């Protein structure tokens, strides 16, 4: 499970501060949803209702997120290196500068693999030490 990171200035950033309450909720929920699903900041249009299930008419608030610059259309290239490349085969949105604070899918998977290998080594070493002490 990846952790979600927020800067302590997040709530007063000029782009976020101008969002309606519903758009703010959608934006923050999208960050959590993207982290949980390893989506690299991409919110597919067909999954928008899943991102913030209690929000009515989420497409309206997605449009507000785009207008305020916290999201952009998934087909639009962003000059920021902190945004994933445009998504060609799906409609949706990208959380702008997602990689500024959130790890990439690739990094999360690599970290999981590293921890799994370390856990296996720890278990082997632990079992060997118990057998040696029993002698």
Indicate residue ranges for each PLM-predicted region.
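Positively charged, structured surface patches that bind polyanionic biopolymers
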Residues: 1-109, 113, 132
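Arg/Lys-rich, low-complexity, intrinsically disordered N-terminal tails that contact nucleic acids
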Residues: 112-135
């Amino acid at each position: 499970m990846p952790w979600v990171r927020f800067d302590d200035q997040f709530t007063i950033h000029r782009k976020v501060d101008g969002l309606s309450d519903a758009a703010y909720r959608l934006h923050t929920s999208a960050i959590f949803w993207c982290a949980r699903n390893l989506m690299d900041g991409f919110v597919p249009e067909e999954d928008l209702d899943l991102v913030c299930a209690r929000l009515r008419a989420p497409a309206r608030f997605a449009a507000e997120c785009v207008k305020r610059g916290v999201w952009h259309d998934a087909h639009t290239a962003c000059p920021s290196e902190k945004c994933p490349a445009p998504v060609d085969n799906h409609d949706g949105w990208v959380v702008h500068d997602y990689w500024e604070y959130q790890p990439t899918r690739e990094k999360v998977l690599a970290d999981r693999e590293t921890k799994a290998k370390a856990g296996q080594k720890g278990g082997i070493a632990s079992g060997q030490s118990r057998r040696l002490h029993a002698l």
